[in-house]
Regions:
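Well-ordered mid-protein domain cores that form the structural environment of catalytic cofactors
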Residues: 1-26
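Short glycine-rich loop/turn motifs that provide flexible caps or phosphate-binding loops at active sites
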Residues: 2, 170, 186
Length: 191
């Protein structure tokens, strides 16, 4: 696929649709994919350029595109014999900042990588995710952040069920030389 599209993967913690507001969340990207019975892989490439700076620079003012460039690989495995699935995600984001007066721009690269696991035996639905971020944020701070989640759901019937879940996102405690606040990027923050 080539063009404006929603990128929705796994539990939507990193890439989600978020289509409840007028703008929605769409990416101008090239998405290449391959799938067979048990495996699926996507390669996503995106590049953003402001109209007013097509020639002579690419400074991004606040409120512009959320990233300069993005490269993402997503892989999903679905088992035959048991109700198990596993996904791996790697995303490299080029975040651009600069000075409008000097037209000096800098691109910082932030990497997010992780896994999402599901197991659905009978009336149970168990899933978990873990993601790690490294690289640099827009402010050129070194990043070392993580997010983890687990969820267990049981369906009594088609109408009633119970869910227990736990989420953890690291925060910036101000200690050390690394920025520790995890950025959920383009995920759906509520459903």
């Amino acid at each position: 696929q080539l063009g404006r599209q929603a990128l929705v993967y796994d539990d939507e913690r990193i890439l989600g649709g978020l289509d409840w507001n007028v703008a929605g969340r769409y990416h101008d990207a090239l998405k290449l994919g391959y799938a067979n019975k048990n495996n699926e892989v996507h390669l996503i490439l995106a590049f953003n350029q402001n109209d007013e700076k097509k020639i002579g620079g690419t400074y991004y003012a606040s409120g512009a595109q959320p990233y300069k460039n993005m490269q993402t690989v997503w892989y999903h495995y679905k088992a035959d014999a048991i109700p198990f699935g596993a996904s791996l995600l790697f995303m490299n984001l080029g975040l651009e900042t600069g000075d409008a007066a000097t037209q000096d721009s800098h691109t910082r690269y932030l990497q997010t990588m992780g896994t999402y696991l599901t197991y659905k035996p009978g009336s149970w639905n168990l899933d978990g995710a873990f993601y790690y971020q490294t690289g640099k944020n827009k402010d050129a701070e070194k990043v070392s952040a993580l997010m983890g989640s687990v969820q267990a759901a049981y369906a009594f019937d088609k109408t009633w069920g119970v869910v227990a879940s736990f989420d953890y996102l690291s925060g910036d405690k101000g200690n050390g030389d690394k920025f520790k606040a995890f950025d959920p990027l383009y995920g759906t923050h509520h459903k």
